[in-house]
């Protein structure tokens, strides 16, 4: 029997309604292995963990949709921006006007150049003198090397790729600017019209090639030639370029563009872009969660605006950010944490949610979630305080924290939550069993794990519990295909698995047991489960009949 039916939503893709602004001090905790790692323009400063709970944002008359739209479209100072490089790698930088963004061989530019620009537009790094080419950084700062360093290498080279006072003063990157890149049209050839083939192209060694050498390319850069002019010079020196097919020419050209162009593309702070960045840099910090699995998780959990969800998140805030983005910051999210400090919401910082957008999020640690828990009183001072005003302020602060904690606990214990989402390293059986009583009937429950065995045990346990209906274990799978005219093949570097999902529907089991169930149990066990009950009922009936029997002699005596 269920109490409530929910209108399920089936979005085909992850929503991209995200935005950018500063986080409150309580949330400024970088995720492990991401913020401040080599390759960032600078280390993100954060305050030490605080036991204070985030206060409610100040009411604003501006529509929330306008806040989200502005965050999603325009870069502001203080934002964390993901820059896509020509090598398809992604670098996270913090936009501050007095910093220099260094990208190794892809050049450098002042961070202030990003302020006011729009996302998802490719910009070229050029010199402000009008020469059309920027000065590349030393090869030791090559970003492609930074991206493949191990954790030990990150510790040894923690200052690598960051701004220092000596570099910032003399770096020619301060003279560079960003301007939108004008690309040439992609070759749109028809299969039937192709005359050229690769039949007469021979593989030559490096010494036999007639293309520009490294020294000649460096000389052209020193003369101020643009990347397009360098590519045209390469084409002019390529003897057999005309023998290539149109597709080979385009592939060759794009390969040279990645080599010579100095471009950046600011990526909008949406869940797909953030997920792509974290899968490249630190997939273990998000439990190897993939975009297709995340979209399935949000769909199974029926996440919608105005919903109320319990979330256990060990992915650095990825699940929380995805739920908050899908909700449009309308509803309520209650997180559970193992420590007394707020969770490490590094991805929320990368998403640059504003105070107003983070207002639906509340959190409790597992001890505070107990119904019998009471917050201990502050220690009593043996001596009277020297400053009564300061002591009174501390008492008011403590009372406000206790009141906010009690409100959050009451909200949990009153129940009525619309769903439960887990992506944690904890035992899912204990977590699901503990939080299920607070869910509404028909509320979906979704658990993610990168390991099959963990969810297999959960499935075996839930099959025996009448509180869970239609519990299933699924695995999502996707593969990227390269589609060209007349040819299609999959990309061979696709990950093997995207993890596993267990989902079920919360129901309230009925105490009524139909007679058909009793007969089925009797056939299955070979016993008559109702014999004792029937014998007791028969005895009761005999007692009632005896009490109702009338003695004829007593009746005659009463008549006399």
From Swiss-Prot:
GO terms for molecular function: RNA binding. Belongs to the TRM6/GCD10 family. Pfam families: Gcd10p. This is tRNA (adenine(58)-N(1))-methyltransferase non-catalytic subunit TRM6. Residues 1-61, 128-171, 510-560 are annotated as: Disordered. Substrate-binding subunit of tRNA (adenine-N(1)-)-methyltransferase, which catalyzes the formation of N(1)-methyladenine at position 58 (m1A58) in initiator methionyl-tRNA. It is found in: Nucleus. Residues 1-20, 128-147 have a biased composition (Polar residues). The gene is TRM6.
